[in-house]
């Protein structure tokens, strides 16, 4: 899984698990179709919807120079009813 960096476990993402929606951070250059293909191929599930947004990088000061970390994209993936990604649920508990 080259494009998916890691799963996100926040209050909102845990609440979305009840609606069969999974949240993860992906590479900023990945497209929605690539992520959908990777999820369907790797986990063997059917994706019906995807929402994505870009999160800005944080500012880092190095002496007088202001730099920043890389921005990344967060995807909220909705699966068809009856499908689930068990490895992500087990990792949280």
From Swiss-Prot:
An annotated Gene Ontology molecular function: structural constituent of ribosome
Main location: plastid
Subcellular location: Plastid, Chloroplast
Pfam families: Ribosomal_L23
Superkingdom per UniProt: Eukaryota
One Gene Ontology term from the biological process aspect of the record: translation
InterPro entries associated with the record: Nucleotide-bd_a/b_plait_sf (IPR012677), Ribosomal_uL23-like (IPR013025), Ribosomal_uL23/eL15/eS24_sf (IPR012678), Ribosomal_uL23_CS (IPR001014)
Record bears the keyword Chloroplast: yes
GO cellular component: chloroplast; ribonucleoprotein complex; ribosome
UniProt entry keywords in alphabetical sequence: Chloroplast, Plastid, Ribonucleoprotein, Ribosomal protein, RNA-binding, rRNA-binding
Family designation: Belongs to the universal ribosomal protein uL23 family.
Database matches in HAMAP family: Ribosomal_uL23_B
Subunit structure: Part of the 50S ribosomal subunit.
Protein task: Binds to 23S rRNA.
Name of the protein in its database record: Large ribosomal subunit protein uL23cz/uL23cy
